[in-house]
């Protein structure tokens, strides 16, 4: 009798409710980042970003460039960008590839699979024992970009992610490292991105990580 393939439900971070931390740029090589795509290097122009994540699919980023503060809030498919003198609201329901999710930070949470992603088991990685899944968007969202992810089945965090565009071309590989555990959740504290020349384009480290601290939903109001 054949063994049943692992399901994404087996490795979701069900204990995750929210997280807050500071993301600090360690490496941001604009030449190598530009090989990923023309816009990818923009986030590496910030020395630090204060990040808040909350289920289901809420994100807040606060940063500063010189004397200018910038806030980005995502609540479901709605995005709000605020800088002094400008507030811009967008509905990204038809542009799911532009939405940031817990996946960007190495987490796979239940809300990602409600009206956004579909997961297909690929294999067990022989070298690491990680489960490998392909994540695609629901067909109704009309976006054929995808992610191939490696998940540690015990600690339930993403160790590696390959990013493919809508033409099926791989753009980059992300490595999620140095996980720390808090309140039953393993959370990576270092992210390295390599381009398709296998050159390190960016490195980000997370400090002051607080898991399930009870972040107010008011922080994510749009």
Label the predicted regions:
Residues 26-33, 53-57, 100-105, 154-163:
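Short, basic/low-complexity N-terminal boundary segments at the transition from targeting/disordered tails
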Residues 49-50, 59, 70, 117-122, ...:
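Residue-level detector of beta-strand structural context in well-folded domains
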Residues 53-54, 73-75, 124-126, 151-153, ...:
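Generic beta-strand structural signal
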Residues 2-10, 14-15, 37, 76-146, ...:
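Flexible, processing/modification-adjacent segments and terminal tails
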Residues 41-48, 69-71, 87-89, 144-146, ...:
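Short, mixed charged/polar active-site loops
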Residues 71-76, 88-97, 173-176, 203-207:
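Short amphipathic beta-strand/extended segments with alternating polar/hydrophobic composition
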Residues 3-87:
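N-terminal mature ectodomain segment of secretory-pathway/periplasmic proteins
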Residues 128-221:
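Gly/Pro-enriched, hydrophobic low-complexity segments
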């Amino acid at each position: 009798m054949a063994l049943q393939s692992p399901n994404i439900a087996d490795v979701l971070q069900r204990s995750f409710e929210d997280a807050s931390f500071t993301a600090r740029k360690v490496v941001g090589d604009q030449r190598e980042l530009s090989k990923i795509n023309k816009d990818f290097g923009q986030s590496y122009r910030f020395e630090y970003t204060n990040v808040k994540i909350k289920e289901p699919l809420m994100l807040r980023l606060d940063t500063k460039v010189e004397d200018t503060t910038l806030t980005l809030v995502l609540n479901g498919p709605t995005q709000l960008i605020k800088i002094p003198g400008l507030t811009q609201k967008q509905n990204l329901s038809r542009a799911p590839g532009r939405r940031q999710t817990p996946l960007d930070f190495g987490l796979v949470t239940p809300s990602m699979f409600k009206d956004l992603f579909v997961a297909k088991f690929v294999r067990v990685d022989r070298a690491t024992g990680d489960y490998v899944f392909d994540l695609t968007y629901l067909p109704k969202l009309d976006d054929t970009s995808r992610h191939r992810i490696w998940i540690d089945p015990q600690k339930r965090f993403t160790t590696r992610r390959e990013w493919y565009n809508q033409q099926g071309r791989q753009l980059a590989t992300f490595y999620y490292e140095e996980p720390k555990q808090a309140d039953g959740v393993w959370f990576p504290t270092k992210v390295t991105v390599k381009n398709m020349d296998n050159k390190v384009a960016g490195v980000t480290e997370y400090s002051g990580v607080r898991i399930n601290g009870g972040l107010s939903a008011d922080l994510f109001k749009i």
